[in-house]
Regions:
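Amphipathic alpha-helical segments typified by the pilin-like N-terminal helix
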Residues: 1-17
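Short, well-structured segments within or immediately adjacent to enzyme catalytic domains
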Residues: 15-170
């Protein structure tokens, strides 16, 4: 029991550290790009162009996006994370679909997503406007009037993770 508790605590610390590393990468990207936030596209544009902060779309199926590390290590934030795919995942997340387990998979490559209000959502946010009337889309670092009240990354539940664009429908 003591070892299990220590392991759980270590996984939590590693998960928080990964979120911090992604946050730092996100800030550095903006600093190198005239304060513009990294793109944060939805499913269709991610699949079509693969030019967003993370280039994979997670599913419960056997699609290559679930395991192909290139979709992470070649994405827009990759050079800011030393192309380390591990920072995109909470180490405690071992959830797989029955189909994935039957194929012998040990894990999927990502469990973290980005707030849909942060970055250009591409076709999701035409003209830089939020897809939700009355809500702000943050495109540059200077757009945040109260940055302490905004989350950027979160460890998303395996049942809902797909693209890198996390939204709670207002």
């Amino acid at each position: 029991p003591a070892l299990a508790k220590a392991k759980t605590k270590a996984q939590g610390i590693a998960c928080m550290s990964n979120g911090k590393q992604l946050g730092l990468a996100w800030i550095l990207y903006a600093g190198d790009n005239e304060e513009r936030l990294v793109d944060n596209h939805g499913i269709d544009q991610t699949m079509g162009q693969r030019r967003t902060w993370v280039n994979n779309v997670m599913t419960w199926g056997l699609e290559p996006d679930n395991t192909n590390l290139n979709f992470i290590t070649e994405a827009k934030l990759a050079s800011y994370t030393a192309k380390s795919a591990g920072v995109y995942k909470c180490p405690a997340d071992k959830v797989l679909s029955p189909q994935q387990r039957a194929r012998g998979w040990s894990q999927r490559v990502r469990s973290l997503s980005m707030n849909a209000a942060c970055g250009d959502g591409g076709t999701l946010t035409p003209n830089g406007q939020s897809p939700f009337p009355g809500y702000k889309q943050f495109l540059r670092m200077g757009d945040f009037s109260s940055p302490a009240n905004i989350f950027v990354f979160l460890d998303e539940h395996p049942d809902s993770i797909n693209d890198g664009w996390f939204v709670n429908n207002p």
